[in-house]
Amino acid sequence: MIVYDKFWETMKRCGESTYTLINRYNISSGTIDRIRKGQGITTAKLDDFCQIFHCRVEDLITYVEPADGEPHSPYSEKIPK
């Protein structure tokens, strides 16, 4: 599962806000809402944020293994181990 905790820290460290992302950089409020809810965003949006914040992807997101009993991606069964 991807978590966005570092996104908020990086945004604050760079002196940006959701207001500036929406109004200065034309990031949609829907994208901000998806991040806030922990939902997926495109790699193109991650690239946009890396350019805005002058950072690397790992400064925005972290992969966390799902706990036992938590639903996995429907694609996980198709990935060879």
Language-model region placement:
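A short, Lys/Arg-rich alpha-helix, primarily the initiator
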Residues: 1-20
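Short, basic-rich loop-to-helix N-cap that marks the start of a DNA-contacting helix
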Residues: 39-51
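Short alpha-helical DNA-recognition segment
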Residues: 15-33
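Residues within the helices of the helix-turn-helix
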Residues: 8, 19, 33, 47, ...
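Short, charged recognition helix plus adjacent turn
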Residues: 9, 62-81
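Alpha-helical residues within the helix-turn-helix
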Residues: 12, 23, 51
